[in-house]
Amino acid sequence: MEALVYTFLLIGTLMVIFFAVFFRDTPRILKK
């Protein structure tokens, strides 16, 4: 059960980082 919780936290952290980078780089992509 603990493994499932740690996996969920890991995926959640990766998604947060991904969206943070994606939204941060979006203005530059749109300017191109």
Swiss-Prot record:
Subcellular location: Plastid, Chloroplast thylakoid membrane
InterPro entries per UniProt: PSII_PsbT, PSII_PsbT_sf
Top-rank taxon, per record: Eukaryota
BP GO annotations: photosynthesis
Sections of the chain in a coiled coil: none
TM segment ranges: 3-23
One Gene Ontology term, aspect cellular component: photosystem II reaction center
The keyword Iron-sulfur is annotated on this UniProt entry: no
Recorded topology in the membrane: Single-pass membrane protein
Keywords, ordered alphabetically: Chloroplast, Membrane, Photosynthesis, Photosystem II, Plastid, Thylakoid, Transmembrane, Transmembrane helix
Main location: plastid
UniProt similarity note: Belongs to the PsbT family.
Quaternary structure (record): PSII is composed of 1 copy each of membrane proteins PsbA, PsbB, PsbC, PsbD, PsbE, PsbF, PsbH, PsbI, PsbJ, PsbK, PsbL, PsbM, PsbT, PsbX, PsbY, PsbZ, Psb30/Ycf12, at least 3 peripheral proteins of the oxygen-evolving complex and a large number of cofactors. It forms dimeric complexes.
Function: Found at the monomer-monomer interface of the photosystem II (PS II) dimer, plays a role in assembly and dimerization of PSII. PSII is a light-driven water plastoquinone oxidoreductase, using light energy to abstract electrons from H(2)O, generating a proton gradient subsequently used for ATP formation.
Protein name, entry field: Photosystem II reaction center protein T
Organism: Thalassiosira pseudonana
Protein's gene: psbT
